[in-house]
Amino acid sequence: MAELTEVRAADLAALEFFTGCRPSALEPLATQLRPLKAEPGQVLIRQGDPALTFMLIESGRVQVSHAVADGPPIVLDIEPGLIIGEIALLRDAPRTATVVAAEPVIGWVGDRDAFDTILHLPGMFDRLVRIARQRLAAFITPIPVQVRTGEWFYLRPVLPGDVERTLNGPVEFSSETLYRRFQSVRKPTRALLEYLFEVDYADHFVWVMTEGALGPVIADARFVREGHNATMAEVAFTVGDDYQGRGIGSFLMGALIVSANYVGVQRFNARVLTDNMAMRKIMDRLGAVWVREDLGVVMTEVDVPPVDTVPFEPELIDQIRDATRKVIRAVSQ
């Protein structure tokens, strides 16, 4: 039995959800789980049911469907390696969505006691909260937007799976682009990308722009407060190589301004490479005065402009503000 536990614990440690956990730390949890095997189309969780269990998916995709009163269900694909069913357990509330196996699924099922074991693993409570918040936020409809060149893209808050899409997606972020963004010649690590994409939407808010409603991420923009509920936040942008020079960064700044006003951020600061002229021009429009911070690096602080200065149609401003409100309300429930 001990040998079987060690094998299962090692299998658990291989899941993306348990990144950083040693197999030995997962042995108590392994004894509390039972095997899961599901065929395509099988309902694993039903919206509205009591929350008694969670599931860890080793292989196979599942689809999470959230029924809404005023429209069709909103569907999100969840890749293997992650947990499902955690939101209702964290909130001690009925299921918030229906989960169906999209492919043959193999994994494990755990009860509330097993979930409590996970919560007591170092760092796992915060990880669970971030995942749950993002899944609630996933039920926000992407906003179709038109940039300076007349092209249409989609704007939405960052969602689960964007780490994988950025690492392995079709949109190229060249060494030069990454250098300007991260001030390093090395490709950002998965750990850094997980920090950048696993956010709380209140102190760390990220908009992404996609090619098509379900398409790849082509750009992102974020603000990160200097402390909980602080009025100062750092801003940063990344735009895929083939999408630069189209006004996407300027558009994303407008969206950040709307969201920042909503959450009470009053000043932005930015730390950029001296030759990152695209970012500097965006900040210059807000009245930036640049100060050298280090060799090849400059920084600035600017006031967050009022929303009525953003060059968007009132309807679009309302959509961005509404999406900000919904995502923050979702994660605070």
From Swiss-Prot:
<dbReference type="GO" id="GO:0005829">
    <property type="term" value="C:cytosol"/>
</dbReference>
<dbReference type="InterPro" id="IPR018488">
    <property type="entry name" value="cNMP-bd_CS"/>
</dbReference>
<keyword id="KW-0460">Magnesium</keyword>
<feature type="binding site">
    <location>
        <begin position="237"/>
        <end position="239"/>
    </location>
    <ligand>
        <name>substrate</name>
    </ligand>
</feature>
<dbReference type="InterPro" id="IPR016181">
    <property type="entry name" value="Acyl_CoA_acyltransferase"/>
</dbReference>
<dbReference type="GO" id="GO:0046872">
    <property type="term" value="F:metal ion binding"/>
</dbReference>
<feature type="binding site">
    <location>
        <begin position="85"/>
        <end position="88"/>
    </location>
    <ligand>
        <name>3',5'-cyclic AMP</name>
    </ligand>
</feature>
<keyword id="KW-0479">Metal-binding</keyword>
<dbReference type="InterPro" id="IPR000595">
    <property type="entry name" value="cNMP-bd_dom"/>
</dbReference>
<keyword id="KW-0808">Transferase</keyword>
<dbReference type="Pfam" id="PF00027">
    <property type="entry name" value="cNMP_binding"/>
</dbReference>
<feature type="binding site">
    <location>
        <position position="276"/>
    </location>
    <ligand>
        <name>substrate</name>
    </ligand>
</feature>
<keyword id="KW-0012">Acyltransferase</keyword>
<feature type="binding site">
    <location>
        <position position="135"/>
    </location>
    <ligand>
        <name>3',5'-cyclic AMP</name>
    </ligand>
</feature>
<feature type="binding site">
    <location>
        <begin position="95"/>
        <end position="96"/>
    </location>
    <ligand>
        <name>3',5'-cyclic AMP</name>
    </ligand>
</feature>
<protein>
    <recommendedName>
        <fullName>Acetyltransferase Pat</fullName>
        <ecNumber>2.3.1.-</ecNumber>
    </recommendedName>
</protein>
<comment type="subunit">
    <text>Homodimer.</text>
</comment>
<dbReference type="InterPro" id="IPR050503">
    <property type="entry name" value="cAMP-dep_PK_reg_su-like"/>
</dbReference>
<comment type="function">
    <text>Catalyzes specifically the acetylation of the epsilon-amino group of a highly conserved lysine residue in acetyl-CoA synthetase (ACS) and of the universal stress protein (USP) MSMEG_4207. Acetylation results in the inactivation of ACS activity and could be important for mycobacteria to adjust to environmental changes.</text>
</comment>
<feature type="binding site">
    <location>
        <begin position="245"/>
        <end position="250"/>
    </location>
    <ligand>
        <name>substrate</name>
    </ligand>
</feature>
<dbReference type="GO" id="GO:0005952">
    <property type="term" value="C:cAMP-dependent protein kinase complex"/>
</dbReference>
<feature type="binding site">
    <location>
        <position position="285"/>
    </location>
    <ligand>
        <name>substrate</name>
    </ligand>
</feature>
<dbReference type="GO" id="GO:0008080">
    <property type="term" value="F:N-acetyltransferase activity"/>
</dbReference>
<dbReference type="InterPro" id="IPR014710">
    <property type="entry name" value="RmlC-like_jellyroll"/>
</dbReference>
<feature type="binding site">
    <location>
        <position position="211"/>
    </location>
    <ligand>
        <name>Mg(2+)</name>
    </ligand>
</feature>
<feature type="domain" description="N-acetyltransferase">
    <location>
        <begin position="153"/>
        <end position="317"/>
    </location>
</feature>
<dbReference type="InterPro" id="IPR018490">
    <property type="entry name" value="cNMP-bd_dom_sf"/>
</dbReference>
<dbReference type="Pfam" id="PF13302">
    <property type="entry name" value="Acetyltransf_3"/>
</dbReference>
<dbReference type="InterPro" id="IPR000182">
    <property type="entry name" value="GNAT_dom"/>
</dbReference>
